[in-house]
Amino acid sequence: MTAQVDRKHLMTSVEMAHFVSHGAIAFEGVVPDELNRRAIDVLDAGIDPVPYGTPLDVAFPEGTFVRELIDLPVVAGAIQSLVGPNPHIDHHAVHVRPPRGGEAQNMHGDAILDTRRDAFDAQLMYYPREVTLEQGGTLSVPGTHLRRINQTGIGRYQNLAGQTRLTCPAGTVVLLHHGIWHGGRRNDSDVPRYMFKIRFNPSVRQLRLWNTDDIDSDGVRRELTRQFGWTNANEGRLELVNRAKLWRTLTGDENFDIDYYLTRETLRPQFIAPGATDVRLGASHAANGWGH
């Protein structure tokens, strides 16, 4: 992963805009069947933990199963597009739900008082087998990743507007913003459900890490203005502001806006008008010669 990924395998600007609005992006069925079959034995045996902040190349050396997975071009390209070429491993975990077993998790976000607004972690979720509704695919609420919560602070809420349940074919990889609201479901099927998660920390500034050839595409704005079941008129406008702020951070374009929201926030003129009623204020020097 230390090597730069070929540009053709990086995410596009439209895909990045989708991630910014949804808080997730899925790559369905991209892992080869042979790797999916091997994954079951690997996950059953468990994968040794690593200390927080371990460089990727140290955590998953070449020749390991996980390295083979994340070196797949589409997966490597997505990781680099989100967190850069040399991310660190925050942590990883194997999640296996037995048949007819487990309990549904409360809704939560994988972040405790994470105040970063100019960076984010990416979480990879790999599903080596098909996930059906009966198997209890991960529940999430698209677009909630920019609404800051303290991990399980929303756990008492159920059946949120706009929530979705993941179903996917074998070999699917999903990448999430660390702040998205989600929760695992119980498995009501007769087969175990497998998922492997890795959380990546960026080690470089997250600035135009993807393929920006289509950055002026109309599709970018369409993705950034997507609405969900919970984004009514009031909440929807606030979410457009949140997305525009993140897009400015990711692109370095400090003039980008959706509608006029962020531009309006900058309207704080310092020029004192001629004839200000409080003589203690004086007038800006540039007003001299205006008359009256």
PLM regions with names:
Residues 1-116:
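Non-heme Fe(II)-dependent double-stranded beta-helix
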Residues 26-27, 126, 174-176:
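Short hydrophobic-aromatic micro-motifs
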Residues 92-94, 124-126, 196-200:
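A structural signal for short, well-ordered beta-strand segments
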Residues 103-167, 205-214:
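Catalytic core of non-heme Fe(II) oxygenases with the double-stranded beta-helix
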Residues 148, 182-184:
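Short, solvent-exposed loop/turn segments at secondary-structure junctions
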Residues 167-182:
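Conserved metal-binding segment of the jelly-roll/cupin
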Residues 185-292:
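Non-heme Fe(II)/2-oxoglutarate
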